[in-house]
Structure formats: C-alpha cells, structure tokens
Amino acid sequence: MSPFQNFMILEEKQLLILMKTNSEICKELVSNPEKFNKLEQFVSLVEEWNKKINLTGFEGENLWKEGINESFFCFEKILETKNLNDFENKSWVDIGSGAGFPIIPFAIIYPKINFYIIESNSKRVRFLELVNEKLNLKIKIFNTRAENFSELKFDFVSARAVAHLDLLIKYFMKITKQDATGYFIKGPKIFEEKEEINNKKISIETLKIDKIKEKNVFVVKMNRI
C-alpha cells in the first residue's frame, strides 16, 4: 500500500470521527447500554422541562457536548487525583446543580457513590426530583442554600460555574469533613479569582481539562491544610 493510500485511510478515519454526533461519542465513552439509556432519558427530560422553566442554555447536540460529555471529561480528570474506589460508599454533594450537570451524569455512571444535591431554586428542585425518581438514582436532594445547610458533613463537594472561588471556599469549609476534597468546575477566570484569595487553611490545585478543546475548562481541587 502506498503512503498516499495510507494517508487517505487516515483522513477517512479522522473524517468519520468528526462526523460522529456528541451522543454517539458519549455512547462510546459509556459503553454500558443501560446507563446510556438513562442518559438519553435525562437529556429528553432536560429538553422537555427547558420549555417550561429556565433550566439551561444547552440544547440539542450542545446538551450532549457541554452537558453530558464535559461532565465525563471532568470526572476523568478527577480520577487522576484519586482511585475510583476512594469514592465508593462516600458522600458527595453538588451545590447549585440547576439542570443536573455534572451530578446527574456522575450518578448514572457511578451508582456506588452516595450523591447529594443542594439547590435553592424550587422549580429546579422539582425537576431534579423527577429525574431522580424516573432514573432510580437515589440522590438525596435538599431545597436550600449552601450557606444555610447544616444537616450533614460531606466527603466530597462539587459545583459547576456557581460562585466566585472565595464563596466556594466558605461553602467547602462549612459543609465538608476535615479530610474532604472539593472539585469545582470553573472557566479561565479562576486564575484572577485565585489571586484574590488569601486563605492559608486551604490548598488549591487547578487542573486543565485537556479533552475540551474549544474553551478552557478547569477542575479546581481543594483541600484543607
């Protein structure tokens, strides 16, 4: 086979990859048909409820791309810091979950983690409760604000584009156990926010999500010192 033919085959493979929809890419990432079916149900519920209330700006293929797949890429980065076994049977709370990203995809794929949600918007809570029931996810949902929450202390905490880093630190210190870890999904402004932080009780590590090419997305890993 000539080098030119090799090049043509490579070009064809790259074209096939580019032609895949984001839902097809997700199906390959997940591989488990039952879990992928739940993701499809979740996406359908988001699209249905988005017509009633302001859940998210994501729709169509972008819902798969920026909602589902980005959630998985973030969890892949998180798994570079700990083994999956470290999360099993531990408590993980997501603050301000809104339409359910990243917590619902996480809960679908990793059912052995005890997931919780803190969400202050009552309409979004009703949506999340419906998703929880329809998909049998067993997430515990609290309709309150993080600053008012005092019922439990968690092993892990996450939030996606919810608040300034300074406020996330306050939430982290209030609702987590002493040896807890925070994973906060942020955009490029995280570096400006870090410059404004002067808290010697917290260590912060910024992890770039390399698989997200179109924009800069980071997981901010947080621990007590």
Swiss-Prot record:
S-adenosyl-L-methionine binds at residues 96, 101, 146-147, 160. The keyword Ribonucleoprotein does not apply. Keywords: Cytoplasm, Methyltransferase, rRNA processing, S-adenosyl-L-methionine, Transferase. Gene3D superfamilies: Vaccinia Virus protein VP39. One of its GO terms (cellular component) is cytosol. The keyword Transferase applies. Pfam families: GidB (PF02527). Its EC number is 2.1.1.-. Its main location: cytoplasm. This is Ribosomal RNA small subunit methyltransferase G. It comes from Mycoplasma mobile (strain ATCC 43663 / 163K / NCTC 11711).
